[in-house]
Amino acid sequence: MDQSRVLLWVKAEPFIVGALQVPPPSKFSLHYLRKISTYVQIRATEGAYPRLYWSTWRHIACGKLQLAKDLAWLYFEIFDSLSMKTPEERLEWSEVLSNCMSEEEVEKQRNQLSVDTLQFLLFLYIQQLNKVSLRTSLIGEEWPSPRNKSQSPDLTEKSNCHNKNWNDYSHQAFVYDHLSDLLELLLDPKQLTASFHSTHSSLVSREAVVALSFLIEGTISRARKIYPLHELALWQPLHADSGFSKISKTFSFYKLETWLRSCLTGNPFGTSACLKSGKKLAWAHQVEGTTKRAKIACNTHVAPRMHRLVVMSQVYKQTLAKSSDTLAGAHVKIHRCNESFIYLLSPLRSVTIEKCRNSIFVLGPVGTTLHLHSCDNVKVIAVCHRLSISSTTGCIFHVLTPTRPLILSGNQTVTFAPFHTHYPMLEDHMARTGLATVPNYWDNPMVVCRENSDTRVFQLLPPCEFYVFIIPFEMEGDTTEIPGGLPSVYQKALGQREQKIQIWQKTVKEAHLTKDQRKQFQVLVENKFYEWLINTGHRQQLDSLVPPAAGSKQAAG
């Protein structure tokens, strides 16, 4: 088969979920990663290759790269969360951790974890995606970019937004521009010069090409099936092009790189393709007096399970509520949604909320990462594997999470609070995403960026300000209470408030008011309640629950 009919593309998930949205440690440069690659490959008997154990990575990261132990674990755990584990395996790991009585016991359990060594090296290298380039900053927009100055178009085909994690053009360009470095990182130390470079005669092992399948996949001709890179590279008709030798069982570095470059193309399941030719969803309605129309698109009708995307933008002044197969297992991006109440009550793969204001987001369990960037006055309610935030102001996070929330750069007035709601299918959805109620680190965030070393950037919600959140929709299912319950201090605050209400009701009852007095009192209470609804913004939420006119009803997902 003609090699021009082979199409390769860069996978989205390693970048959407795996690339931490913060400049990487300086020790993750190619120079140090090459040294690590050589170090681990010559220590195969010491838990370093082909599987890298946590204890070995901890030794390398803390002892040689001078990283803090928490940061070393963070990168190790993020990569591990990308691995193909069943929900049952993830729940089993949560149970193991929840039974640990000390940090020493936790560390003992972590020491049993291992990851694919070569893939982990690639994972560390792609952290360079979010490296700050001084040259780009000088010739492009100011960095940091003034938030109120941003007038970038909303989710256009070639989005110029700064979120490279969702930009498949950035993914493709990154791999194409650094392909030689990526291949050299995977070479056997014997194939490198003294300065850690390849030669024209360098050979690439099958294991290295298997590892590169972490980033690249593809298809042949018009076949609908997707293949990992190594299966295509090892396919008999392509040996001459990919440079594979049956005798040495290796690839020619030069031929392999040339073949990869000639076949790399855009991701047919990426954000750009989704926005250009994806299915448009009529989930939102047009609000009177606004010119911008909500844009919601998905590729779930054509994409395989791990490639599903849902992108929504410009939902404005309304309630949008969905529990849909379209959302199940999808990577979701929510962009420029303002003054809205958005409920996505399905098990989700990942969620990114970007440039949203004055809104509430209630999400089904998020199996990997929930990330917020450049949001103001937003409340997020979710069970998620990981929460990370950057450039947020005045946001509140009611979360249940087995990992420490990550506070990245540029945040102000962050509030964390316990998860405080439920819907009938919640526990079923948690089981499907492998999320348990313990351990729960909602109140122990990790400040990742040095500028935020001052812990005052966040606070825990005072119990006196805590209320449970009621999801105002009927669904089938068995969950009838908040999974895992509430922390005792918050449960106590609710009990005290309920007691005050009962005392007040008793006082009114024993006042023996006349009929006219009762009527006057009722009007007074209703007026005060109405004022409270307006002052708190709850009036808008109640109004938005009223279904729109028949002609603009939200479509079923």
Swiss-Prot record:
The protein's name: TBCC domain-containing protein 1
Organism: Homo sapiens (Human)
Family designation: Belongs to the TBCC family.
Keyword set, alphabetical order: Cytoplasm, Cytoskeleton
Gene name per UniProt: TBCCD1
SUPFAM superfamilies: C-terminal domain of adenylylcyclase associated protein
Residue ranges annotated for the C-CAP/cofactor C-like domain, each copy included: 290-435
Pfam families in alphabetical order: TBCC
InterPro entries: C-CAP_CF_C-like, CAP/MinC_C, CAP_C_sf, CARP_motif, TBCC1, Tubulin-bd_cofactor_C_dom
PANTHER family: TBCC DOMAIN-CONTAINING PROTEIN 1
UniProt main location, coarse: cytoplasm
Localization of this protein: Cytoplasm, Cytoskeleton, Microtubule organizing center, Centrosome; Cytoplasm, Cytoskeleton, Spindle pole
Signal peptide stretch: none
Lineage of producing organism: Eukaryota, Metazoa, Chordata, Craniata, Vertebrata
GO biological process: maintenance of centrosome location; maintenance of Golgi location; regulation of cell migration; regulation of cell shape
Protein role: Plays a role in the regulation of centrosome and Golgi apparatus positioning, with consequences on cell shape and cell migration.
Any one annotated GO CC term: spindle pole centrosome
